[in-house]
Amino acid sequence: MDYRTLHPQIAAAYRVLETGSPISQAEALLLAELPGELVLDLASLANKVKNRYGTGSAGSELLHACSIMNAKSGVCGENCRFCAQSRHNRADIEVYDLVDAESVLIEARNCFAEGVSHFGIVTSGYGYKRINPEFQRVLDMIDRLHEELPELSVCASLGMLGEEPAEALAAHGIAHYNINIQVVPDRYHDLIADTHSVEERIETIKLLRKNNISVCCGGIMGVGETMQERIAMIFALQELDVSVIPLNVLVPIEGTPLAGKEPLSVAEIVKTFAICRLAHPHKIIKFAAGRETIMKDFQGLLMLSGANGFLTGGYLTTRGRDIADDRRFASQIASFN
């Protein structure tokens, strides 16, 4: 390819396509300054890198689609500023304790029947430092899902973990575990929460990796971080060597401290996804919250800017797009591979 017509920073970044080696943080910071139509040139490169290398360490699929179930909702003692489920906030959401196993099975069956092969059980709260009766119920749910839907990839997001629960999840065959660092670690305290530390999340990630559990870990953009800090978060994930990187865009929710936050521009979101792909050529990069509500008409552009996964069927407290619609969406995206 003749790179002479490209911006010098983009031309230099084509090294990722040729070698599969990631860009440096210094290169990422320069790419973040690209204006206007150059963002589409950057997105084009990220799409090529995704197509060549992005099957990911989480599996061989070209597009990683997953669905989650909010199995325990609200009354969380942590004070995450963006979250509707925190009891410190005043969002109007449904509140309930851990659901029964049959409810989880019904939801999982429906998702699997619609063609979704990854299903996650999500609970509100700090997490589980030891195996208590509630955590044991979650383990029993995982076993039931394996028995009834052996081809389903069963995942979980249960908060911070101690060594015993992490070992138990591995023993019960969990496929992926989600726990996000949200922002660059040194801004976690003031941008996200101060009732727990980001180090507790990182310790959980290390425990999961010690037990050979694939880690799904990413962040949220639009909570007050700068682009430079967002890039620092992307490279912090590189150091943690996670398998799946979900990137969320803040959806401001009434009753939370970030309710009036101005949304990020489409161009800035696209640029972030493209840079993340160039920093993580071989990973699954998944677009989660904000796909429908913030990107709207442009959501397909992110799947052509480095993303190769998405959350379908709904989020924890807000509705997403129907799985059938997303299947049609995915089939159209595949024509650009």
From Swiss-Prot:
Cofactor binding summary note: Binds 1 [4Fe-4S] cluster. The cluster is coordinated with 3 cysteines and an exchangeable S-adenosyl-L-methionine. Binds 1 [2Fe-2S] cluster. The cluster is coordinated with 3 cysteines and 1 arginine.
Cofactors that this protein relies on: [4Fe-4S] cluster; [2Fe-2S] cluster
Organism for this UniProt entry: Pelodictyon phaeoclathratiforme (strain DSM 5477 / BU-1)
Subunit structure: Homodimer.
Pathway listed: Cofactor biosynthesis; biotin biosynthesis; biotin from 7,8-diaminononanoate: step 2/2
HAMAP family: BioB
GO molecular function: 2 iron, 2 sulfur cluster binding; 4 iron, 4 sulfur cluster binding; biotin synthase activity; iron ion binding
Binding site for [4Fe-4S] cluster: 76, 80, 83
Pfam families named in the record: BATS, Radical_SAM
UniProt family annotation: Belongs to the radical SAM superfamily. Biotin synthase family.
Gene that produces this protein: bioB
Enzymatic reactions: (4R,5S)-dethiobiotin + (sulfur carrier)-SH + 2 reduced [2Fe-2S]-[ferredoxin] + 2 S-adenosyl-L-methionine = (sulfur carrier)-H + biotin + 2 5'-deoxyadenosine + 2 L-methionine + 2 oxidized [2Fe-2S]-[ferredoxin]
Keywords on record: 2Fe-2S, 4Fe-4S, Biotin biosynthesis, Iron, Iron-sulfur, Metal-binding, S-adenosyl-L-methionine, Transferase
Keyword set includes Disulfide bond: no
PROSITE patterns with a match to the protein in the record: RADICAL_SAM
Enzymatic class: transferase
Domain of life: Bacteria
Protein residues bound to [2Fe-2S] cluster: 155, 216, 286
InterPro entries for this protein: Aldolase_TIM (IPR013785), BATS_dom (IPR010722), Biotin_synth/BioAB (IPR002684), Biotin_synthase (IPR024177), Elp3/MiaA/NifB-like_rSAM (IPR006638), rSAM (IPR007197)
Function recorded in the entry: Catalyzes the conversion of dethiobiotin (DTB) to biotin by the insertion of a sulfur atom into dethiobiotin via a radical-based mechanism.
Enzyme Commission designation: 2.8.1.6
Record-given protein name: Biotin synthase
Gene Ontology biological process: biotin biosynthetic process
Gene3D superfamilies linked to this entry: Aldolase class I
